[in-house]
Amino acid sequence: FAEGETAEKKPEQDTKKYSKFFDEKTKWCDALVITCNDFRFTTATQEFLNNRLGLKGKYDYISIPGSIRNLMDSKTRDLVLNKFGVSVRLHRVNRVIILAHQDCSGYGGSAAFHESADEFKAISKDLKKARMLMGIKFRHLKVYLYYGTIFYDNHNRIYNFKQIL
């Protein structure tokens, strides 16, 4: 290098490089999926997204303990929404799929409720609030909600994901 020159790139060069990447990109992410990281639901969730919703290879996947509980907590809400915003903005997401499930430790598990109907009602209420919060922050998004359950039949796990309207 000549005297006074450095190997550092100027910020404008990086901006042009990334701008060109986004300008030339023709395929974008179809959805942002937000789900709990409970190991009992991992495989079933992937199968549901890939096969039943037809999203294989077309979504960003954010898995956090308790899923929407962090969005309900005013102390962590902004942090969570800002993290979601990165995916929404950079990958041009137009829809969000939020999955919650029965027996979630974030809610104290099923034992914290008198009946499974009470658990479903409480978590569904939070899912709907999450949809409202996402809609306030990201007005263009369509938000779809699902509640997952496990049934046991002859030692086999049977999963069901019910859409919450």
PLM-predicted stretches and their roles:
Residues 55-56, 94:
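Short coil/loop linkers at secondary-structure junctions
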